[in-house]
């Protein structure tokens, strides 16, 4: 049996922390732009992700980079890799 555990490039996205009320978990809002199929106008689309924040270091308004991981719970399968920009206090 061959070993198929190659180093795959994990998905990483950047987003803004909109909630840090849970213990060791933050909600990250990820915005992207998609082109409308018929009219060609670029439209903003957003997704909310639950990400693991082991140190409870993230505050609301921080811009963070998150990466995909194996599921930790029903809704949490992302992990905070780094805080890019801190929110103004």
Curated annotation (Swiss-Prot):
One of its GO terms (cellular component) is cytosolic small ribosomal subunit. The keyword Lipid metabolism does not apply. Keywords: Ribonucleoprotein, Ribosomal protein, RNA-binding, rRNA-binding. One of its GO terms (biological process) is translation. The keyword rRNA-binding applies. InterPro entries: NA-bd_OB-fold, Ribosomal_uS17, Ribosomal_uS17_bact/chlr. GO terms for molecular function: rRNA binding; structural constituent of ribosome. It comes from the Bacteria. Pfam families: Ribosomal_S17. Part of the 30S ribosomal subunit. PANTHER family: 40S RIBOSOMAL PROTEIN S11 FAMILY MEMBER, SMALL RIBOSOMAL SUBUNIT PROTEIN US17M. One of the primary rRNA binding proteins, it binds specifically to the 5'-end of 16S ribosomal RNA. Belongs to the universal ribosomal protein uS17 family. This is Small ribosomal subunit protein uS17.
């Amino acid at each position: 049996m061959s070993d198929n555990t190659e180093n795959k490039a994990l998905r990483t996205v950047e987003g803004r922390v909109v909630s840090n009320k849970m213990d060791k978990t933050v909600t990250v809002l990820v915005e992207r732009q998609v082109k409308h199929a018929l009219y060609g106008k670029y439209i903003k689309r957003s997704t909310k992700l639950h990400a693991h924040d082991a140190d409870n270091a993230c505050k609301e308004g921080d811009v963070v980079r998150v990466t995909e991981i194996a599921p930790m719970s029903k809704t949490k399968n992302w992990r905070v890799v780094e805080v890019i920009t801190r929110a103004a206090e």
